[in-house]
Amino acid sequence: MTASITEIDSISEESNVESVSHLQHSPSFEKKGADFSISLNEKKDFASPITEEIPSPDGIATPEPETKKKLSFGARVWDLICSPGRQHDVCVAAPTQLVRSCDDYANSASTLVTNDDGTKTKVDSDEKKHKHKNVRDYIRFKHVDIGGRIFDLITRLAGTSFTFILMLIILIVWAIVGGIYRAPDNWQIVMQDGSSIQCYVSDTLLMRQQQNQHIQVLTMISQLRSRLLTTSRLLGPVLNDKTKISSVNVALMKDDVGDAEKLPTENWFDFICNYVSFMVGSIIFLVVYWIGIFIWIGFGRMLGWSDEWQLYINTAVAVELTFTSVFLQNVRHRHMKYIDRCVTSIFRIDSVIEEELRRMMGDKEPNEEITIKMDKINLGERSIDYYADLIGSGVGVVVSTCVFVAWIAIGNVMHWDSNWWLIIGTYTGLVGFLDGFVLRNVYFRESSKEATEIQTLIDEDYALYQKLDLPLPHEHITNYKSTFGGSLSQWIGWLCALPISVLFSVFVILGLIIAAGSLRFNETAQLFCNTPTMIIEGALLIVLIEAHNIANLKRRIQFRQIHLRRLTILKMLAGDNYSTTSTV
């Protein structure tokens, strides 16, 4: 089932493309009367059929004609309840260059000139100017509803360097206050509650960030494959006609996206973050973390296994959770910026290649739409996706707000004592424990899907080079080498990502609640709930950072090599006229 959501206006070649709205449930996107369309086709349940979109003569996608029964009110309510977590196929056609434009422009000699206003100008033999605007960038998604856009804005802000530095300042101030007042219990409880609430919110933002970046990467891949099909179709005949190649006059693009293995550092903060990301996500850091836990257990008998003993580890882990959760958001944000920069450069190169090939061949056939089919999932994975979708949506925000309001409301009844302070930490700690496993499971499956689709794109790249009998360039420059620590971290990550691991976390939570209930949820019971869940959640975040580092490093290298292969094709087309002095 698909439904038209919004329209996109054409923009100039040097500006960013207007973002295409992305609605999580059954969205579809078209550009009316234009060359491209983006849609997310909904897969209901596990393998239900979807309504295909077929292009009409005027370029507007229209549903396949079929008789459709109107759902009853009860059926619509049930459909709404079941909608979170549904899988969607991604259908994208890259913006076609010079399709349906004037014949004089398409057949004239190539003089790619970019004016200040971003409009390309060509002059034919009659000195008559023709202007045309082409979409150079790739099409981006954004939510169509105002609530979704605000949520996405908050998610982006949470990943910025400003937010990360602000959190570091708060931790430093808290540590100074504790030193002045000699670390009283209330000081420790404040950190535990604050950390639990912050991690609870961060889990929501991390899930939202993960979902948005996943659909964005699949959209990038689909559009790259769409344009590659056109390039492959037109490039062979052009290369066979050497007389046409000499007419290409393009001085465009230099290799300026930076090293994929060592991210480009814009300032000292980026340099430090790259190093810290490597250290925090390493197997060494994870081993040190667990050594610290066992040392704490060793002091248990000396301290009489008291509440104070539990407070110590809870406070230490709370600091680690706050740091790693905010740091993970920042790492993802910075890594995605590099990929966006690299893919933007690839798209601009691709658009120039496509435009030149179409001019030479007089071709106006639109770029083909590429559909990425979502994998079939089982009942357990569907349940996990349902919960994850609720976390990363407005529903999760509403539930969180209600819980915090209820907690504040009972404060006066409980006389604002230590037990009241611990209640919110217990709730957010238990939920955060489950969220950690859910995040890992969803990330593992989404990352695997992205890796599969990127490899499909690479295989099609290789097929083009083989078809043209060209050597693959630059493959020796950057190749990911797995280490023992990296392999061990990946294995631990895989183990934590299993659906059975998520189910295990649910049983652990139920067991802790039953045990705490037998103690009437007193201070000792709540600390007992917090301690093991916080320890495991802290370890899961370390594993998640390492998993992201490994997967993102591979992805950056792959996009980087795609960029270099596109530059090779552009240089081959331009011949001696190619220059690397211009910027992207």
From Swiss-Prot:
Subcellular location: Golgi apparatus membrane; Cell membrane
Residues bearing glycans: 522
Domain of life: Eukaryota
Regions that span the bilayer: 161-181, 278-298, 311-331, 390-410, 419-439, 494-514, 527-547
Cytoplasmic face of the membrane: 182-277, 332-389, 440-493, 548-584
GO CC entries: cell division site; cell tip; Golgi apparatus; Golgi membrane; plasma membrane
One of the record's GO molecular function terms: iron ion transmembrane transporter activity
Residue numbers spanned by region Disordered: 1-28
InterPro entries: Iron_permease_Fet4
Membrane topology, record value: Multi-pass membrane protein
Isomerase recorded as keyword: no
Keyword field: Cell membrane, Glycoprotein, Golgi apparatus, Ion transport, Iron, Iron transport, Membrane, Transmembrane, Transmembrane helix, Transport, Zinc, Zinc transport
Expression induction or repression: By zinc deficiency.
Ranges in the topological domain labelled Extracellular: 1-160, 299-310, 411-418, 515-526
A Gene Ontology biological process term: zinc ion import across plasma membrane
Functional summary from the UniProt entry: Required for Fe(2+) ion low affinity uptake. Has a role in zinc uptake under conditions of zinc limitation.
Family of the protein in this entry: Belongs to the FET4 family.
Protein name: Low-affinity iron/zinc ion transport protein fet4
Species per Swiss-Prot/TrEMBL record: Schizosaccharomyces pombe (strain 972 / ATCC 24843)
Chain's gene name: fet4
